[in-house]
Amino acid sequence: MFSTSNTLLYADKLTDFNMPMPHIYACHLSDQLIQFTGPDKKSYLHGQITQDVNLLTNDALLWAGQCDAKGKLWSILRLFNFQDDYFAITSKDEIENALAEFKKYAVFAKVDIEQNKNHQLVGLFGDDLSAVLSELEIILPTENNSTIDFKFGKAIKLDNNRLILCIDKKAQLPSCITLLESEQKWQSLSILAGEPKLNNQAIAEYVPQMVNLQAIGGISFKKGCYKGQETVARMKFLGKNKRAMYILEANTNKPFEATEVEQQLGENWRRAGKLIQTSFDIDTNRAYALAIMPNDLALDTLLRTKQENPISIEIKPLPYSLIEE
């Protein structure tokens, strides 16, 4: 378990998004934690997910997918190791199914799987994080998607401008941070980074490659068997996958209300795909989304939301390549 004998200083909350933003700010994340303990945790988890758990060192952050027998995703996970236990970060929409599926066969192994409710996940972001890193005594690794232990828990580096802090719920943040009451800005940054996350409607709908999990190192094609492996392998080696996840952006004064997007074909509009995550930045009047659409869709395709008053959408380039080696 985490050791938190000391607590951090209190941070004032910023409730008005139109106020000037500081260089360093944070928000409490709605993402949830699953904790794996026991002598069989590695072998058990290894047989449940798309990732090679042998790669889960103390300083690694690994993406993974948890599939059903047909290869459809129950959840998308980010795994890290701390004090001999494994932790998986997943969304508030995915946690219930993920936990139930992980526990289904745990009775046959020496492993305990529980939702960890004693700790909080805090998204920390800004142009220059050096001041808060110094105050927290965190020396970040140079690599993205890496982790480091520090005196209050675990620091997870996503990139040079974004961290996740996993700390005790009683711990607070340094006074140099402004704590936002909404995670919308964090969610927008996650979407622009092309980081997949499922909403309720997307659970058990897509295979891992449809949410670009292979492009961010979330699938091992060399490991042993796991639930759904046959479908995942067939998608890769037989070229069966026809969909991918795209980043969408719109100039609008309100959030996306639709769950689907349409593309223009001549004078008509046809269904193009579904939204799996959305966010809205009230400061810039920009809405963002992740959508699952055909993987041969051109970046200049005309898109709009499927709703009574459609919103025009543009496709943003992904920050990583979908071309497999």
Which residues does each PLM region occupy?
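Residue-level signal for inorganic ion chemistry
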Residues: 38, 88, 126, 228, ...
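Acidic, low-complexity central loop/insert segments
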Residues: 23-28, 32-33, 78-193
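Short amphipathic beta-strand starts and helix->beta connectors
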Residues: 14-21, 63-76, 104-107, 145-153, ...
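Glycine-centered loop/turn motifs
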Residues: 59-60, 136-148, 254-262, 300
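Anionic-ligand-binding alpha/beta catalytic cores of soluble enzymes and soluble regulatory domains
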Residues: 166-249
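Acidic, proline/glycine-enriched N-terminal capping motif
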Residues: 1-76, 80
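Short, conserved charged micro-motifs
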Residues: 40-45, 95-99, 129-133, 170-177, ...
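Glycine-rich, small/acidic residue-mixed loop/short-helix segments
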Residues: 211-219, 233-325
